[in-house]
Protein backbone atom coordinates (compact mmCIF):
# COMPACT_ATOMS: atom_id res chain seq x y z
CA UNK A 1 0.00 0.00 0.00
CA UNK A 2 1.08 3.57 -0.60
CA UNK A 3 -0.30 7.05 -0.02
CA UNK A 4 -0.54 9.32 -3.06
CA UNK A 5 1.18 12.65 -2.39
CA UNK A 6 -0.07 15.41 -4.70
CA UNK A 7 2.67 17.76 -3.49
CA UNK A 8 5.27 15.43 -5.06
CA UNK A 9 3.34 14.93 -8.31
CA UNK A 10 4.42 16.31 -11.67
CA UNK A 11 1.32 15.46 -13.71
CA UNK A 12 1.01 17.91 -16.60
CA UNK A 13 -0.26 18.30 -20.16
CA UNK A 14 2.35 19.26 -22.76
CA UNK A 15 1.35 20.68 -26.17
CA UNK A 16 4.02 21.22 -28.82
CA UNK A 17 3.15 22.87 -32.16
CA UNK A 18 5.75 23.25 -34.93
CA UNK A 19 5.14 25.27 -38.10
CA UNK A 20 7.70 25.30 -40.89
CA UNK A 21 8.25 26.85 -44.32
CA UNK A 22 10.95 25.82 -46.80
CA UNK A 23 12.56 27.54 -49.77
CA UNK A 24 15.27 25.97 -51.91
CA UNK A 25 16.84 26.29 -55.33
CA UNK A 26 19.03 23.97 -57.41
CA UNK A 27 21.40 25.20 -60.11
CA UNK A 28 23.27 22.71 -62.30
CA UNK A 29 26.12 23.50 -64.68
CA UNK A 30 28.08 20.66 -66.28
CA UNK A 31 29.50 18.60 -63.37
CA UNK A 32 28.60 21.16 -60.70
CA UNK A 33 25.46 21.41 -58.56
CA UNK A 34 24.74 24.45 -56.39
CA UNK A 35 21.95 24.27 -53.78
CA UNK A 36 21.07 27.25 -51.55
CA UNK A 37 18.11 27.01 -49.19
CA UNK A 38 16.45 28.39 -46.11
CA UNK A 39 13.92 27.06 -43.59
CA UNK A 40 11.79 28.96 -41.09
CA UNK A 41 10.42 27.23 -38.01
CA UNK A 42 7.99 28.52 -35.41
CA UNK A 43 7.57 26.41 -32.27
CA UNK A 44 4.89 26.96 -29.64
CA UNK A 45 5.00 24.98 -26.38
CA UNK A 46 2.37 25.02 -23.65
CA UNK A 47 2.61 23.16 -20.35
CA UNK A 48 -0.34 23.02 -17.94
CA UNK A 49 -0.12 21.22 -14.61
CA UNK A 50 -3.04 18.97 -13.74
CA UNK A 51 -1.79 17.75 -10.35
CA UNK A 52 1.18 18.98 -8.34
CA UNK A 53 2.85 22.21 -7.29
CA UNK A 54 4.40 23.00 -10.67
CA UNK A 55 3.64 26.30 -12.37
CA UNK A 56 2.06 26.46 -15.84
CA UNK A 57 4.35 27.96 -18.46
CA UNK A 58 4.61 28.56 -22.19
CA UNK A 59 7.46 29.37 -24.53
CA UNK A 60 7.89 30.17 -28.22
CA UNK A 61 10.84 29.65 -30.56
CA UNK A 62 11.36 31.37 -33.94
CA UNK A 63 14.30 30.12 -36.00
CA UNK A 64 15.61 30.93 -39.48
CA UNK A 65 17.84 28.10 -40.72
CA UNK A 66 20.00 28.64 -43.85
CA UNK A 67 22.00 26.09 -45.83
CA UNK A 68 24.14 26.02 -48.96
CA UNK A 69 26.13 23.32 -50.75
CA UNK A 70 28.28 22.87 -53.84
CA UNK A 71 28.68 19.42 -55.36
CA UNK A 72 31.11 18.28 -58.03
CA UNK A 73 30.95 15.04 -60.00
CA UNK A 74 34.42 13.51 -60.39
CA UNK A 75 33.39 10.49 -62.44
CA UNK A 76 30.58 8.03 -62.96
CA UNK A 77 30.64 6.87 -59.33
CA UNK A 78 32.60 9.60 -57.52
CA UNK A 79 31.39 12.85 -56.00
CA UNK A 80 32.78 15.63 -53.83
CA UNK A 81 30.70 18.07 -51.81
CA UNK A 82 31.34 21.15 -49.70
CA UNK A 83 28.61 22.79 -47.69
CA UNK A 84 27.38 24.88 -44.80
CA UNK A 85 24.26 24.41 -42.72
CA UNK A 86 22.84 25.64 -39.47
CA UNK A 87 21.17 23.15 -37.19
CA UNK A 88 18.83 23.96 -34.34
CA UNK A 89 18.11 21.93 -31.26
CA UNK A 90 15.01 22.95 -29.37
CA UNK A 91 15.05 22.25 -25.63
CA UNK A 92 12.80 19.39 -24.58
CA UNK A 93 10.33 19.29 -21.74
CA UNK A 94 12.98 17.77 -19.45
CA UNK A 95 15.13 20.89 -20.05
CA UNK A 96 12.27 23.40 -19.74
CA UNK A 97 10.16 22.04 -16.89
CA UNK A 98 10.71 24.39 -13.89
CA UNK A 99 9.41 21.79 -11.44
CA UNK A 100 11.63 21.91 -8.33
CA UNK A 101 12.51 18.25 -7.85
CA UNK A 102 13.80 17.88 -4.30
CA UNK A 103 12.61 14.34 -3.74
CA UNK A 104 16.20 13.76 -2.67
CA UNK A 105 16.93 17.02 -0.79
CA UNK A 106 20.68 16.64 -1.33
CA UNK A 107 20.42 16.18 -5.14
CA UNK A 108 18.01 18.77 -6.53
CA UNK A 109 17.15 19.21 -10.22
CA UNK A 110 15.14 21.89 -11.99
CA UNK A 111 14.49 22.85 -15.61
CA UNK A 112 14.68 26.34 -17.08
CA UNK A 113 11.66 27.62 -19.01
CA UNK A 114 13.69 30.58 -20.35
CA UNK A 115 15.95 28.46 -22.55
CA UNK A 116 16.43 29.41 -26.20
CA UNK A 117 16.96 27.17 -29.23
CA UNK A 118 20.51 25.94 -29.54
CA UNK A 119 22.07 26.95 -32.87
CA UNK A 120 25.03 25.15 -34.39
CA UNK A 121 26.92 26.24 -37.53
CA UNK A 122 28.60 23.44 -39.47
CA UNK A 123 30.98 23.30 -42.44
CA UNK A 124 31.70 19.98 -44.11
CA UNK A 125 33.73 18.51 -46.93
CA UNK A 126 32.88 15.01 -48.15
CA UNK A 127 33.96 12.49 -50.76
CA UNK A 128 31.91 9.51 -51.90
CA UNK A 129 32.40 6.61 -54.26
CA UNK A 130 29.48 4.25 -54.83
CA UNK A 131 29.81 1.22 -57.07
CA UNK A 132 28.23 -2.21 -57.27
CA UNK A 133 30.92 -3.80 -55.09
CA UNK A 134 32.46 -1.00 -53.05
CA UNK A 135 30.90 2.02 -51.32
CA UNK A 136 32.81 4.62 -49.34
CA UNK A 137 32.00 8.00 -47.87
CA UNK A 138 34.56 10.14 -46.03
CA UNK A 139 33.57 13.41 -44.40
CA UNK A 140 35.52 16.15 -42.61
CA UNK A 141 33.41 18.47 -40.46
CA UNK A 142 33.85 21.51 -38.24
CA UNK A 143 31.06 23.07 -36.21
CA UNK A 144 30.72 25.77 -33.59
CA UNK A 145 28.00 26.84 -31.21
CA UNK A 146 27.81 29.96 -29.06
CA UNK A 147 24.66 29.25 -27.05
CA UNK A 148 24.66 25.54 -26.29
CA UNK A 149 22.34 24.21 -23.61
CA UNK A 150 24.43 22.80 -20.78
CA UNK A 151 23.56 21.01 -17.58
CA UNK A 152 25.10 23.03 -14.76
CA UNK A 153 25.60 21.67 -11.25
CA UNK A 154 26.80 23.60 -8.22
CA UNK A 155 27.19 22.99 -4.52
CA UNK A 156 25.07 24.99 -2.07
CA UNK A 157 27.51 26.48 0.44
CA UNK A 158 25.42 29.03 2.38
CA UNK A 159 24.79 27.80 5.97
CA UNK A 160 21.14 28.86 5.72
CA UNK A 161 20.71 27.15 2.34
CA UNK A 162 19.45 28.89 -0.78
CA UNK A 163 15.95 29.77 -1.96
CA UNK A 164 14.90 29.52 -5.62
CA UNK A 165 12.06 31.19 -7.57
CA UNK A 166 11.26 33.41 -4.56
CA UNK A 167 9.35 30.42 -3.20
CA UNK A 168 9.95 29.52 0.47
CA UNK A 169 9.18 25.88 -0.35
CA UNK A 170 12.02 25.80 -2.90
CA UNK A 171 14.91 25.58 -0.47
CA UNK A 172 18.20 23.81 -1.19
CA UNK A 173 20.04 23.09 2.08
CA UNK A 174 23.74 23.57 2.66
CA UNK A 175 25.72 20.75 1.07
CA UNK A 176 23.06 19.97 -1.57
CA UNK A 177 23.97 19.62 -5.24
CA UNK A 178 21.67 21.77 -7.41
CA UNK A 179 21.44 21.13 -11.18
CA UNK A 180 19.68 23.07 -13.92
CA UNK A 181 20.11 24.06 -17.60
CA UNK A 182 21.29 27.28 -19.26
CA UNK A 183 22.36 28.62 -22.68
CA UNK A 184 25.89 29.32 -21.48
CA UNK A 185 28.07 26.99 -23.52
CA UNK A 186 30.44 27.66 -26.37
CA UNK A 187 31.59 24.62 -28.28
CA UNK A 188 34.02 23.90 -31.09
CA UNK A 189 33.99 20.45 -32.67
CA UNK A 190 36.20 19.05 -35.42
CA UNK A 191 35.77 15.52 -36.62
CA UNK A 192 36.02 12.96 -39.37
CA UNK A 193 33.62 10.16 -40.25
CA UNK A 194 33.97 7.10 -42.45
CA UNK A 195 31.40 4.75 -43.97
CA UNK A 196 32.60 1.69 -45.85
CA UNK A 197 30.60 -1.14 -47.43
CA UNK A 198 32.28 -3.99 -49.31
CA UNK A 199 30.36 -6.70 -51.13
CA UNK A 200 33.15 -9.25 -50.85
CA UNK A 201 31.13 -11.91 -52.67
CA UNK A 202 27.54 -12.37 -53.84
CA UNK A 203 26.74 -13.79 -50.38
CA UNK A 204 29.04 -11.82 -48.07
CA UNK A 205 28.95 -8.16 -47.10
CA UNK A 206 31.25 -6.27 -44.71
CA UNK A 207 30.52 -2.79 -43.39
CA UNK A 208 32.21 -0.24 -41.15
CA UNK A 209 30.97 3.06 -39.78
CA UNK A 210 33.25 5.14 -37.56
CA UNK A 211 33.98 8.66 -36.47
CA UNK A 212 36.49 10.63 -34.43
CA UNK A 213 35.85 14.03 -32.89
CA UNK A 214 37.72 16.65 -30.88
CA UNK A 215 35.57 18.92 -28.70
CA UNK A 216 36.42 22.16 -26.93
CA UNK A 217 33.68 23.38 -24.56
CA UNK A 218 33.68 26.63 -22.63
CA UNK A 219 31.46 28.83 -20.47
CA UNK A 220 33.10 32.13 -19.63
CA UNK A 221 30.22 33.14 -17.33
CA UNK A 222 30.73 30.06 -15.16
CA UNK A 223 34.51 29.87 -15.55
CA UNK A 224 34.25 26.36 -17.00
CA UNK A 225 36.40 24.78 -19.72
CA UNK A 226 36.68 21.19 -20.88
CA UNK A 227 38.09 19.52 -23.97
CA UNK A 228 39.00 16.10 -25.29
CA UNK A 229 38.66 13.39 -27.91
CA UNK A 230 35.73 11.10 -28.55
CA UNK A 231 35.37 8.27 -31.03
CA UNK A 232 32.81 5.66 -31.96
CA UNK A 233 32.80 2.60 -34.17
CA UNK A 234 30.25 0.22 -35.64
CA UNK A 235 30.97 -2.69 -37.93
CA UNK A 236 29.89 -6.13 -38.93
CA UNK A 237 29.63 -8.88 -41.48
CA UNK A 238 26.57 -10.44 -43.09
CA UNK A 239 26.61 -13.79 -44.87
CA UNK A 240 23.88 -15.74 -46.64
CA UNK A 241 23.83 -19.50 -46.01
CA UNK A 242 21.97 -22.17 -47.96
CA UNK A 243 18.16 -22.02 -47.65
CA UNK A 244 18.47 -18.20 -47.73
CA UNK A 245 19.38 -18.00 -44.05
CA UNK A 246 21.19 -14.74 -43.33
CA UNK A 247 23.69 -14.57 -40.48
CA UNK A 248 25.01 -11.28 -39.13
CA UNK A 249 27.71 -10.47 -36.60
CA UNK A 250 27.96 -6.87 -35.38
CA UNK A 251 29.92 -4.92 -32.83
CA UNK A 252 30.79 -1.41 -31.84
CA UNK A 253 31.36 1.06 -29.08
CA UNK A 254 32.28 4.56 -28.07
CA UNK A 255 34.86 6.26 -25.90
CA UNK A 256 33.56 8.54 -23.09
CA UNK A 257 31.81 11.65 -24.38
CA UNK A 258 32.89 15.11 -23.24
CA UNK A 259 30.58 17.64 -21.57
CA UNK A 260 31.16 21.02 -19.97
CA UNK A 261 31.74 19.73 -16.42
CA UNK A 262 33.19 16.29 -17.01
CA UNK A 263 32.60 13.26 -19.15
CA UNK A 264 30.07 10.50 -19.60
CA UNK A 265 30.54 6.80 -19.93
CA UNK A 266 32.08 4.83 -22.76
CA UNK A 267 30.46 1.61 -23.91
CA UNK A 268 30.76 -1.34 -26.25
CA UNK A 269 28.38 -3.97 -27.56
CA UNK A 270 28.23 -7.04 -29.78
CA UNK A 271 25.41 -9.02 -31.32
CA UNK A 272 24.63 -12.09 -33.37
CA UNK A 273 21.54 -12.52 -35.51
CA UNK A 274 19.91 -14.88 -37.98
CA UNK A 275 16.96 -14.26 -40.28
CA UNK A 276 14.92 -16.08 -42.92
CA UNK A 277 12.27 -14.70 -45.27
CA UNK A 278 9.25 -16.61 -46.52
CA UNK A 279 6.28 -16.30 -48.89
CA UNK A 280 6.10 -14.43 -52.17
CA UNK A 281 8.27 -11.32 -52.34
CA UNK A 282 9.64 -12.31 -48.89
CA UNK A 283 6.70 -10.68 -47.12
CA UNK A 284 7.20 -12.75 -43.96
CA UNK A 285 10.47 -12.69 -42.01
CA UNK A 286 11.64 -14.67 -38.99
CA UNK A 287 14.45 -13.09 -36.95
CA UNK A 288 16.52 -14.39 -34.04
CA UNK A 289 18.76 -11.89 -32.28
CA UNK A 290 21.00 -11.82 -29.21
CA UNK A 291 23.36 -9.18 -27.82
CA UNK A 292 25.99 -8.97 -25.08
CA UNK A 293 25.20 -12.56 -24.14
CA UNK A 294 28.35 -13.10 -22.05
CA UNK A 295 27.58 -10.31 -19.58
CA UNK A 296 25.03 -10.35 -16.78
CA UNK A 297 25.57 -6.77 -15.65
CA UNK A 298 26.94 -3.57 -17.12
CA UNK A 299 28.22 -0.45 -15.42
CA UNK A 300 28.20 3.10 -16.75
CA UNK A 301 30.25 5.83 -15.12
CA UNK A 302 29.67 9.59 -15.21
CA UNK A 303 32.06 12.22 -13.90
CA UNK A 304 30.94 15.77 -12.99
CA UNK A 305 33.25 18.36 -11.44
CA UNK A 306 32.70 21.94 -10.31
CA UNK A 307 33.65 24.48 -7.69
CA UNK A 308 34.01 22.70 -4.32
CA UNK A 309 32.54 19.39 -5.49
CA UNK A 310 33.24 16.21 -7.42
CA UNK A 311 30.43 13.81 -8.34
CA UNK A 312 30.85 10.29 -9.71
CA UNK A 313 27.97 7.98 -10.54
Map each language-model feature to its residues.
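Transmembrane beta-strands of outer-membrane beta-barrel proteins
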Residues: 1, 34-38, 66, 80-82, ...
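Outer membrane beta-barrel strand-and-loop segments of large Gram-negative receptors
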Residues: 3-15, 19, 110-112, 116, ...
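Surface-exposed extracellular loop regions of Gram-negative outer-membrane beta-barrel proteins
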Residues: 16-55, 61-67, 71, 76-121, 142-174, 198-214, 257, ...
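Residues on the lipid-exposed face of transmembrane beta-strands in outer-membrane beta-barrel proteins
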Residues: 21-27, 68-72, 125-129, 140, ...
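Outer-membrane beta-barrel strand-turn architecture
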Residues: 27-31, 64, 72-76, 88, ...
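C-terminal beta-signal and adjacent terminal beta-strands/loops
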Residues: 278-313
Amino acid sequence: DYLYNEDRSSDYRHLNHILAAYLGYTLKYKDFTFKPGVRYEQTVQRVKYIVGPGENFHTNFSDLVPSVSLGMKLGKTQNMRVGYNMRIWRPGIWNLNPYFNNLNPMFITQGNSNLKSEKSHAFDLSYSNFSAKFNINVSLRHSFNNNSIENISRLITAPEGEMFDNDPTHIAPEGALYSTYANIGKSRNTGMSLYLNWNASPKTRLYVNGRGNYSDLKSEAQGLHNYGWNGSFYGGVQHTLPLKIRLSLNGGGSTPYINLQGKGSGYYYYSLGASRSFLKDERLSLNVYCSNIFEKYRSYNNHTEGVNFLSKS
